[in-house]
Design a protein with these regions (language model features):
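Short, contiguous strand/loop micro-motifs
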Residues: 10-13, 129-130, 161
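Hydrophobic faces of well-ordered beta-strands that scaffold small-molecule active sites
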Residues: 14-18, 33-38, 66-73, 153-157
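Flexible loop/turn segments at secondary-structure boundaries
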Residues: 24-25, 44-45, 77-79, 163-166
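Generic C-terminus detector
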Residues: 147-184
Length: 184
């Protein structure tokens, strides 16, 4: 028996290639696919990868033109200081990953009470280069600057914090500052 998905839409879904290297950008260009650069994985050289993708793009039956999306890790809060505080749980999670510990994102209290060595503070600073954080206006300005620098056609954000409600608030504040929803 044949299996047929229902309902059938008028078009096929868009195909994206998510990557964080020049290889993935070149592959997306060669195959005529949309490309999402994973800034949240690697911020280094991504702007050049995006420019090369657009320059080398080969139209395909699926996509006539290049389309580039920038995926960014964001933590938005009412104040810059609060965003910095909320980032601490992710800082500790990334340190744990550096140590080979694959555990859930720690809660805020655990992150705030942890004593860090100088080397760990350096690792935190290294990882923070891939994060946009702050109050809504700060985050908006940084995201728009990144979009221009990377020549992105679209932005996509990912927010990870120590609890669901702060993630939800981050998205709500972003939606508000970008006027994507009606104020509550």
């Amino acid at each position: 028996a044949k299996v047929k998905a229902q309902p059938m839409g008028p078009t096929a879904p868009e195909v994206w290639l998510l990557g964080s290297s020049d290889y993935s950008g070149a592959l997306a260009a060669e195959l005529g696919l949309r490309f999402a650069f994973a800034h949240f994985i690697s911020a280094d050289g991504g702007d050049q990868v995006m420019r090369d993708y657009k320059r080398k793009y080969q139209p395909s039956p699926r996509e006539a033109e290049a389309h580039a999306l920038l995926t960014v890790f964001v933590i938005c809060a009412e104040t810059d200081a609060e965003a910095e505080r909320r980032a601490m749980s992710v800082d500790l999670r990334r340190l744990n990953m550096d140590y080979g510990i694959n555990s859930p994102v720690p809660n805020q209290r655990e992150a705030e009470t942890r004593a860090y060595t100088d080397v760990e503070r350096q690792r935190i600073a290294f990882h923070r280069r891939r994060v946009v954080l702050g109050k809504p206006d700060t985050v908006k300005a940084k995201l728009l600057a990144l979009a221009a620098q990377f020549e992105a056609d679209e932005l996509m954000v990912i927010t990870i914090t120590g609890d669901y409600l702060t993630r939800l608030e981050s998205y709500r504040l972003l939606a508000g500052v970008f006027e994507l929803c009606q104020p509550a």
